[in-house]
Swiss-Prot record:
Disulfide bond entries: none
Native source species: Chromobacterium violaceum (strain ATCC 12472 / DSM 30191 / JCM 1249 / CCUG 213 / NBRC 12614 / NCIMB 9131 / NCTC 9757 / MK)
The gene coding this protein: rpsS
GO BP field: ribosomal small subunit assembly; translation
A single Gene Ontology CC term: cytoplasm
Protein name (record): Small ribosomal subunit protein uS19
Length: 92
């Protein structure tokens, strides 16, 4: 279910303050955040945001086609190791 248009996109206030501070100083270091629920705004384009995935901070470089998506979509929380192989099939 999509968010109502009249409400606008959700961005955590502390993340927005960090982005404004980085834009003012033109710092190239990644912005560390735990806010996976924040929507990517056009102001974020060109910045690197380190999004927490539950264990580490994954650096995400924000490009133009990411606008409107959530930060958590680009920082995967689960690692897929593959399905267990059938031992009988390997012997043949």
């Amino acid at each position: 279910m999509a968010r109502s248009q009249k409400k606008g996109p959700f961005v955590d206030l502390h993340l927005l303050k960090k982005v404004d501070a980085v834009r003012a100083t033109s710092d190239k270091r990644p912005i560390k955040t735990w806010s996976r629920r924040s929507t990517i705004l056009p102001d974020f384009i060109g910045l690197t945001i380190a999004v927490h995935n539950g264990r580490t901070h994954v650096p995400v470089y924000v490009s133009e086609n990411m606008v409107g998506h959530k930060l958590g979509e680009f920082s995967l929380t689960r690692t897929f190791k593959g399905h267990a192989a059938d031992k009988k099939a390997k012997k043949k």
